[in-house]
């Protein structure tokens, strides 16, 4: 039988700079509410038979120490090659004690990772190097991690095509999207949970604003939607959360979602 997601943890809910932003004294960056502290965007999913990491940014080490999770990671789904989504891959080293870890990405991202981390992909690796290998995937072509079905689909990060992922029947994860082609919307029917990016109030050339994310959420119509990849320009979590419709939420670091 196919496996499905039953639990997910938001490891990081922030944009590329994180929140607080270094040197900023705005009310969000100086807020005492822990929900206003945002590490770079990443999530950890538990399905019936797999543990799956989505993106592995520069805060990955700190995120895993916070959740105190040390177990086999069955696969890492990479959305795109920007540093805030792949900068922590070297920190997978302790998790390689459980065995080699497959890294799933499109070919463009895989090419960048080979260039950026060549030492990980040599035939004769130096001891202590992460035991990871690349698996290239394409939008619309499903694959499995153990018995958990994954469907990659294309979203547009400004002009850069990147990947979103539907994991099992119930959950989909999208980050860094500005727009999405029609065929991707067709892959996203009947979702229990949608995780999607909402950067800030004002429009941005490569990321959805909060109002654009609300339109996307409405169109997809998941039972619950969680926004991620926020900057300090979204305002205080407590204030911004009150303005959202029912069943739409701002995620925060450490948030657990049971399905």
Protein language model features and the residues they cover:
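Short beta->alpha connector loops
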Residues: 57-60, 155-159, 177-180, 231-233
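Cap/insert and terminal regions of metallo-dependent hydrolase folds
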Residues: 179-259
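Metallo-beta-lactamase
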Residues: 106-161
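Active-site beta-strand termini and strand-to-loop segments that position acidic
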Residues: 45-48, 145, 165-169
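Active-site-proximal beta-strand elements of phosphoester/diester hydrolases
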Residues: 7-13, 53-55, 149-155, 170-176
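Short, small-residue-biased leader/transition segments that mark boundaries at the very start
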Residues: 1-6
């Amino acid at each position: 039988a196919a496996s499905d997601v039953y639990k997910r943890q938001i490891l990081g809910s922030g944009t590329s700079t994180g929140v607080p932003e270094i040197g900023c004294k705005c009310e969000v960056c100086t807020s005492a509410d822990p929900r206003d502290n945002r590490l770079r965007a990443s999530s950890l999913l538990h399905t019936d038979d797999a543990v799956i990491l989505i993106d592995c940014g520069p805060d990955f080490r700190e995120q895993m120490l916070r959740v105190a999770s040390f177990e086999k990671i069955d696969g890492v789904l990479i959305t795109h090659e920007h540093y805030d989504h792949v900068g922590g891959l070297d920190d997978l080293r302790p998790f390689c004690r459980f065995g080699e870890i497959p890294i799933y990405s499109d070919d463009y991202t895989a090419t960048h990772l080979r260039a950026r981390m060549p030492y990980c992909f040599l035939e004769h690796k130096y001891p202590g190097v992460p035991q990871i290998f690349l698996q290239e995937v394409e939008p619309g072509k499903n694959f499995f991690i153990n018995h958990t079905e994954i469907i990659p689909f294309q979203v547009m990060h400004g002009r850069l095509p990147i990947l979103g992922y539907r994991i099992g029947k119930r959950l989909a994860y999208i980050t860094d999207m500005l727009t999405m082609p029609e065929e991707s919307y067709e892959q996203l029917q009947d979702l229990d949970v949608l995780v999607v990016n909402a950067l800030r109030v004002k429009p941005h050339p490569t990321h959805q604003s909060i109002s654009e994310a609300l339109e996307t959420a409405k169109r997809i119509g998941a039972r619950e939607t969680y926004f991620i990849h926020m900057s300090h320009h979204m305002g205080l979590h407590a204030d911004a959360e009150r303005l959202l419709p029912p069943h739409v939420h701002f995620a925060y670091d450490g948030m657990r979602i049971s399905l």
